[in-house]
């Protein structure tokens, strides 16, 4: 692990390869698992504000869940997460004509309808952020549904941190990411990665 400011980064983030292959996985990370995506407290209001913009895109089951419990809930581990439908799909998940799932929030962002991209934890996946007092931990999360992304990352030689440059900058800032790149060069120079 290396430390940049108050952020500790696992070496896996530099060593492992990853490049989403949506055509292969069809967005499984949005529909698999036992809880919704982690949400930061300040994102709840943004989720609620974008709701009227994306409401008609959402499945009837998702709208029913949102009407009953809201856009987020506290999971078994005590974390705030996006609401889910039938213990599976994120409520913001939609499907295209090919059966590929996509995020209704991200689609609205790309269509210029909102400034909110999507929860940062979704944007950062397969990185997960842990809070440890004054420190944050950046870890690479391995999941079987992302096997195609690992293969594509190896083929294209794209490390996790490179694939996630934009969301890492969103979370920690441009200066932090530049320091991360300097650290990578140092680690490579000393054959540590």
Predicted regions and their residues:
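Short loop/turn segments that flank or connect secondary-structure elements
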Residues: 1-193
